[in-house]
C-alpha cells in the first residue's frame, strides 16, 4: 500500500466533510440531549507458569511461578453529544502484578487509552474522526473489544507496534470508517510516537532491524471486509471477539499497515558499516464466523482464521511475556536486541509469517440447568503458527484450550485456560534452543 493512495482517499473524504459543514444546523441539534454510556471492566488473573530456563524472580532462580494480577482495568464513557457527533473516552491500566515497577514505584497510574472525536458525515456510510484511538487497518484483533474476548486473551502479535511506537496499541490518528451495503471499511493515518519514549531503554543499532531512533514517517493503514450475513456494530472502532450466538456473522477481511523508515539496522558497505532503514509492511487476510447453531437451545459456533505477513525489516524479532511474573535470567550471551527472555516471554513479534486459528462451541443454555441461575459454558481452542526470518523460517507453534463459564454472558465470566508455548532462548550468535513450557490461568472478568 502506498502512502499517496491513502492520503488521496483522506483528502477526498475531507472535501466531503467541508461540503457537509456548509449546511445550516437544524433545530433538533440545538435541543438534542446527549446520550451517554458508562462502562467498567476488571480482569483478575490467578496463574501458574512454567518458567523459561534460567529465570529468576528478585534474584532467586525459579523453575515455576504463581502470581495474581490485574490483566486489564478499564473505565469507558461515550455517547452522541449532538446529532452526528460522537465522543469516546477510555482510561485504565494493564498488566499489574507483583513485578510492576515504574521507576521504583509500584503505584500504577491510570492513563488515557482512547480520546476519540467522530462526526457522522453520511450516517454509517462515512464517519470521520480523530484523536488517540485503537482504530487501525490490519486485523480485527488489532482493535479488539476486550469485554468480548473469546479466549483468555487476544493474539497480541496482531497489535504490531504495541508499546513500541504507540500507547498500548492506541495511536494519534485521523480515521475514516463506515459501512456501505455489505462492505465494512476503515482508513487510518497515524502519527507514531518515537520508540525512545516508551519507558524502556531501546537497543543499540546492530545487524538486525529494531525500531529506528531517528527519522519520522506517518503510518498508513487500511482495512476492508465483506459481510455475508448480519452486519457488525459500528458505534465504536472496537471489533467483537464473539457474539455468543446473538448474531449470525460471516465476514472476510483484508488489512494492511505501512510505515516508511520504521526500523533500522547496520549493513556492510564499501566504507564499513552503513545505516540502513526499512519500511514496516504488514498485511492480513482473515475469515470470521460467529453464529448460532440452535437458536432455541442457545448453542453457537465460532471459527476464525487469520493469515498474516509481518515485515519489520531484516531479521526483526521481539520477545514478549504478558504480565511477566519474573524479572531476570542466569543465562549469559543472549541476544540483546530482541527483548527480555525470562519468565513467560516468547518470540511474539517478528519479520515473517503467522497463522492464527480460533475455534469455540457455546453449549446449550440449559446444559447446567436454568441459565439464569447456573450460567452457560463455552469451550475453545487456539493455535498460533509462526515462521520468522530470524529462525530461518522454521515453524513454531503455541496453543491454548479453555473453558468459559458465562454468568450471564461476558458480564460475569470465569475462564480456565491451559496454554503451551515454544520457550526459545536466542543467543547473540543467532543460535537458539527450544523447549516447551505451559501456563495455567484462572481469570474472573466483570464487565458492567
Which residues are covered by each model-predicted region?
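A short, compositionally biased domain-edge/stem linker segment
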Residues: 20-30, 236-241
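Primarily recognizes Gram-negative and organellar outer-membrane beta-barrels
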Residues: 46-69, 87, 95-101, 199-202, ...
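Short glycine/proline- and aromatic-enriched beta-strand/turn motifs that initiate or cap beta-hairpins
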Residues: 20-21, 34-55, 255-259, 263-266
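Outer membrane beta-barrel
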Residues: 27-51, 63-196, 214-232, 309, ...
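Outer-membrane beta-barrel pore domains
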Residues: 51, 61-62, 244-448
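Bacterial Sec-dependent N-terminal signal peptides
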Residues: 1-23
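Active-site rim elements
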Residues: 103-104, 200, 206-212, 271
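Loop-centered beta-sheet repeat module
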Residues: 210-263
Amino acid at each position: 500500500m502506498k502512502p499517496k493512495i491513502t492520503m488521496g482517499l483522506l483528502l477526498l473524504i475531507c472535501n466531503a466533510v467541508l461540503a457537509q459543514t456548509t449546511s445550516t444546523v437544524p433545530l433538533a441539534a440545538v435541543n438534542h440531549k446527549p446520550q451517554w454510556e458508562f462502562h467498567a471492566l476488571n480482569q483478575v488473573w490467578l496463574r501458574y507458569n512454567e518458567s523459561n530456563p534460567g529465570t529468576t524472580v528478585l534474584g532467586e532462580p525459579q523453575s515455576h511461578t504463581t502470581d495474581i494480577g490485574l490483566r486489564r482495568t478499564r473505565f469507558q464513557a461515550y455517547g452522541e453529544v449532538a446529532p452526528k457527533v460522537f465522543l469516546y473516552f477510555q482510561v485504565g491500566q494493564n498488566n499489574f502484578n507483583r513485578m510492576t515497577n515504574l521507576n521504583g514505584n509500584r503505584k500504577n497510574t491510570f492513563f488515557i487509552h482512547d480520546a476519540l472525536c467522530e462526526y457522522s458525515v453520511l450516517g454509517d456510510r462515512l464517519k470521520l474522526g480523530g484523536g488517540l484511538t485503537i482504530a487501525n487497518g490490519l486485523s480485527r484483533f488489532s482493535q479488539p473489544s476486550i469485554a468480548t474476548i473469546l479466549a483468555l486473551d487476544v493474539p497480541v502479535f496482531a497489535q504490531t507496534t504495541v508499546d513500541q511506537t504507540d500507547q498500548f496499541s492506541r495511536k494519534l490518528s485521523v480515521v475514516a470508517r463506515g459501512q456501505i451495503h455489505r462492505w465494512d471499511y476503515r482508513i487510518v493515518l497515524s502519527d507514531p510516537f518515537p520508540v525512545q519514549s516508551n519507558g524502556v531503554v531501546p537497543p543499540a543499532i546492530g545487524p538486525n532491524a529494531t525500531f529506528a531512533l531517528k527519522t519520522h514517517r506517518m503510518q498508513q493503514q487500511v482495512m476492508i471486509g465483506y459481510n455475508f450475513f448480519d452486519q457488525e456494530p459500528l458505534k465504536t472502532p472496537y471489533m467483537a471477539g464473539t457474539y455468543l450466538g446473538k448474531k449470525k456473522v460471516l465476514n472476510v477481511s483484508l488489512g494492511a499497515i505501512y510505515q516508511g523508515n520504521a526500523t533500522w539496522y547496520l549493513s556492510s558497505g564499501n566504507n564499513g558499516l552503513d545505516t540502513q532503514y526499512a519500511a514496516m509492511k504488514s498485511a492480513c487476510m482473515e475469515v470470521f464466523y460467529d453464529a448460532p447453531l440452535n437458536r432455541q437451545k442457545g448453542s453457537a459456533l465460532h471459527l476464525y482464521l487469520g493469515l498474516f505477513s509481518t515485515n519489520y525489516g531484516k531479521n526483526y524479532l521481539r520477545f514478549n511475556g504478558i504480565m511477566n511474573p519474573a524479572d531476570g535470567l542466569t543465562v549469559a550471551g543472549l541476544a540483546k536486541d530482541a527483548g527480555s527472555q525470562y519468565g513467560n516471554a516468547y518470540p511474539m513479534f517478528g519479520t515473517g509469517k503467522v497463522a492464527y486459528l480460533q475455534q469455540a462451541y457455546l453449549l446449550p443454555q440449559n446444559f447446567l440447568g436454568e441459565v439464569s441461575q447456573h450460567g452457560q459454558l463455552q469451550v475453545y481452542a487456539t493455535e498460533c503458527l509462526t515462521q520468522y526470518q530470524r529462525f530461518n523460517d522454521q515453524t513454531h507453534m503455541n496453543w491454548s484450550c479453555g473453558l468459559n463459564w458465562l454468568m450471564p454472558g461476558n458480564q460475569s465470566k470465569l475462564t480456565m485456560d491451559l496454554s503451551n508455548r515454544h520457550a526459545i532462548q536466542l543467543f547473540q550468535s543467532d543460535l537458539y534452543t527450544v523447549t516447551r513450557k505451559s501456563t495455567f490461568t484462572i481469570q474472573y472478568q466483570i464487565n458492567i
